[in-house]
Amino acid sequence: MNIAANIADDPETGDIDDGAGPALFADAPRSVSFNKLRKRLLRQVRQAFDDFDMLKGQKRWLVGLSGGKDSYGLLALLLDLKWRGLLSVELIACNLDQGQPNFPKHVLPDYLTKIGVRHRIEYRDTYSIVKEKVPEGATYCSLCSRLRRGNLYRIAREEGCDALVLGHHREDILETFFMNFFHGGRLASMPAKLLNDEGDLMVLRPLAYAAEDDLARFAAAMQFPIIPCDLCGSQDGLQRNAMKDMLADIERRMPGRKDTMLRALSHVNPSHLLDPKLFDFSSLGVTDPS
């Protein structure tokens, strides 16, 4: 498995003609650099599909759309793959309006209607619950995320979907790994494919191999109508920000280390760790020389 940024040319993805693609690509840049970026992201999504068998038994997906660069990018790439005949799954875009102050309610439905994507926008005032439960000065993100996830599961079931598809990328996975490493005392990250606790829905992250910088460039070029993620006034947790800064510093000092770290997560050697639940150390013994 090669998860470096420059994956070898994929003949099935093919060349991209200027202006080619689904409706949302109508105003996309006509440049070699953008086409290379687009093709790289498409290959990385397809590689995640293959590596984690994401398409097995899948007919309909609920695509979580927050209004941020990552979820917009995810939706665009999935639509691009459908346009190319490389993805047969039906897509439903979904945004959960959580009652955050100043949330621009018109942005997502207007955009999704314009590009002709089936969608569902639902209002659930989880913001008031978070305000009530979280102490003053603490970050809302963790509880807000859990409440959002529960509602998205419900909506996925109501829409007859097989999976909830989310826009987490390479950096999200690495940051989660180091948060668990430094603060949780365990080796765990954010899986690319997960069966929910009830066992009736998959959670898929097709952008697992995609770099955040690439997604930011893609979003800027596509001119997605971005909705800021800090409308509630809360900021990302200090722990995650510290991990983000640490990873950025490592990448500046030693370019390419993020790809190396991500590759390490798929090359685990239990016999060289310290968990007897993963490896039977009691079975080891010195060979009798006689």
Curated annotation (Swiss-Prot):
Intracellular or extracellular location(s): Cytoplasm
Name this polypeptide is given: tRNA-cytidine(32) 2-sulfurtransferase
UniProt remark on cofactor binding: Binds 1 [4Fe-4S] cluster per subunit. The cluster is chelated by three Cys residues, the fourth Fe has a free coordination site that may bind a sulfur atom transferred from the persulfide of IscS.
Predominant location: cytoplasm
PANTHER family for the chain: AMINOTRAN_5 DOMAIN-CONTAINING PROTEIN, SULFURTRANSFERASE-RELATED
Motif (PP-loop motif): 66-71
GO molecular function: 4 iron, 4 sulfur cluster binding; ATP binding; magnesium ion binding; sulfurtransferase activity; tRNA binding
GO biological process, one term: tRNA thio-modification
Keyword Mitochondrion attributed: no
The entry's keywords: 4Fe-4S, ATP-binding, Cytoplasm, Iron, Iron-sulfur, Magnesium, Metal-binding, Nucleotide-binding, RNA-binding, Transferase, tRNA processing, tRNA-binding
Cofactor(s) required for function per UniProt: Mg(2+); [4Fe-4S] cluster
Reaction it catalyzes: cytidine(32) in tRNA + S-sulfanyl-L-cysteinyl-[cysteine desulfurase] + AH2 + ATP = 2-thiocytidine(32) in tRNA + L-cysteinyl-[cysteine desulfurase] + A + AMP + diphosphate + H(+)
Physiological role: Catalyzes the ATP-dependent 2-thiolation of cytidine in position 32 of tRNA, to form 2-thiocytidine (s(2)C32). The sulfur atoms are provided by the cysteine/cysteine desulfurase (IscS) system.
Pathway named in the protein's UniProt entry: tRNA modification
UniProt-listed Gene3D superfamilies: HUPs
Other remarks on this protein: The thiolation reaction likely consists of two steps: a first activation step by ATP to form an adenylated intermediate of the target base of tRNA, and a second nucleophilic substitution step of the sulfur (S) atom supplied by the hydrosulfide attached to the Fe-S cluster.
Matches recorded under HAMAP family: TtcA
Enzyme type, top EC level: transferase
GO cellular component, one term: cytoplasm
Subunit structure: Homodimer.
Annotated residues for binding of [4Fe-4S] cluster: C141, C144, C232
InterPro entries found in the cross-reference section: Rossmann-like_a/b/a_fold (IPR014729), TilS/TtcA_N (IPR011063), tRNA_Cyd_32_2_STrfase (IPR012089), tRNA_thiolation_TtcA_Ctu1 (IPR035107)
Disulfide-bond pairs as recorded: none
